[in-house]
Amino acid sequence: MSGDAFNMSVAYQPSGMAVPEWLNKGDNAWQMISATLVGMQSVPGLVILYGSIVKKKWAVNSAFMALYAFAAVWLCWVTWGYNMSFGHKLLPFWGKARPALGQSFLLAQAVLPQTTQFYKGGGGADAVVETPWVNPLYPMATMVYFQCVFAAITLILLAGSLLGRMNIKAWMLFVPLWLTFSYTVGAFSLWGGGFLFHWGVMDYSGGYVIHLSSGVAGFTAAYWVGPRSTKDRERFPPNNVLLMLTGAGILWMGWAGFNGGDPYSANIDSSLAVLNTNICAATSLLVWTCLDVIFFKKPSVIGAVQGMITGLVCITPGAGLVQGWAAIVMGILSGSIPWFTMMVVHKRSRLLQQVDDTLGVFHTHAVAGFLGGATTGLFAEPVLCSLFLPVTNSRGAFYPGRGGGLQFVRQVAGALFIICWNVVVTSLVCLAVRAVVPLRMPEEELAIGDDAVHGEEAYALWGDGEKYDSTKHGWYSDNNDTHHNNNKAAPSGVTQNV
């Protein structure tokens, strides 16, 4: 056998053009895997979840809204969005728009140029560096990919508030506008080296940038778009609960990349973040389910999914910053407080009743995201903070030492900025889109659904996803196919057909 057969591929040699000295193959591989996991949360995860959790006549439209947003964000991101979020500073809350497409840019070592932290708050000659800029050991192409899927899922989560009535043409315009004028501001301010980043506001993986933003913006957009049809608001059953669980499962497992990739390295903090994520999600799901059983006498599968999501959202701002016991506490809170706002406060609030938030994104993402940010300000452990944050000696208020109480104030102030910005900008975007096309579908399309909007239907089945109505069709027995047209209680052995 020739000795050449044993030659190592250039990709695995210690040096060479494809493997520069600064490249860490483990970090690069983990970052691309994390990005792909987050991408799979959207496609197919949320595509499946949205397509199955809605009424049958809206399955195609709901899934397509997610698919379109994922594709549209990609093009906007590499054309101008990435550098507005992670490039050089234009304003304290915004980066300069420029493409992220050139070979020299994408193959260079990744760096977030505005993330250098100075003790005296500036970059002058007398300034002393507190923490150097973020400079991961992989190419910029990996960073652009990783951050893009986060931007995409934010728009898709926002869409959950608008399912079942938003004009698809209006959605096509809304996505690039909202990405440009809202998402990039939150991302730069908190992650890219903006004023909240340097002030020390903690958002480990997007509790504010993604979840609080999408929840508030979704609720605001739902106000401007208007409600679903009266019939749909009264009855909106999921068309396939098992597919809904499939999408939810992809979402849960994909969160390993969502939170595990944010240290920008395959390090010990990444491992802790993944573990805490699962602890909090499991705790929240169980608490939500227990509350359903206590107050409604039955465990709701949809409720379990909502509890899972609120747990995942709540841990996101502090996934790698809190200890395991704190993740359990956050899970208890995220399984109970959003449950209370959705099941109790929502029914008593005129504003919440007026705004038709289809999937309750305000509760599952805005409330849970704010809760996660606030509790991170309480439970962030000092040693863990030193592994990730630019401001040294950061800590939550629960831990003694200088700055703990101030950290909680920072967290609340950061949340208020994100809330106010999204209310104002989302309203302006909706008004701008409304000047071009109607935000809401016409009543004729609302009555028909997918076939009117897309000329396609998800299932060639009878009915609209609702259960068999015994008051109209009588009882059907497994032992007797005779239908009894009466309103008496179902006898033993009787089932309600779907």
Swiss-Prot record:
Annotated keywords: Ammonia transport, Membrane, Transmembrane, Transmembrane helix, Transport
One Gene Ontology CC term in the entry: plasma membrane
UniProt xrefs under Pfam families: Ammonium_transp
InterPro entries for the chain: Ammonium/urea_transptr, Ammonium_transpt, Ammonium_transpt_CS, NH4_transpt_AmtB-like_dom
PROSITE patterns per record: AMMONIUM_TRANSP (PS01219)
Sequence intervals crossing the membrane: 33-53, 58-78, 143-163, 171-191, 206-226, 241-261, 276-296, 301-321, 325-345, 369-389, 412-432
Biased composition annotated in UniProt, kind: Polar residues: 487-498
Tissue distribution: Expressed in root.
GO-annotated biological processes: ammonium transmembrane transport
Subcellular location per the Swiss-Prot or TrEMBL entry: Membrane
A GO molecular-function annotation: ammonium channel activity
Span list, region Disordered: 478-498
Membrane topology: Multi-pass membrane protein
Function recorded in the entry: Involved in ammonium transport.
Family recorded in the similarity comment: Belongs to the ammonia transporter channel (TC 1.A.11.2) family.
Protein name: Ammonium transporter 3 member 1
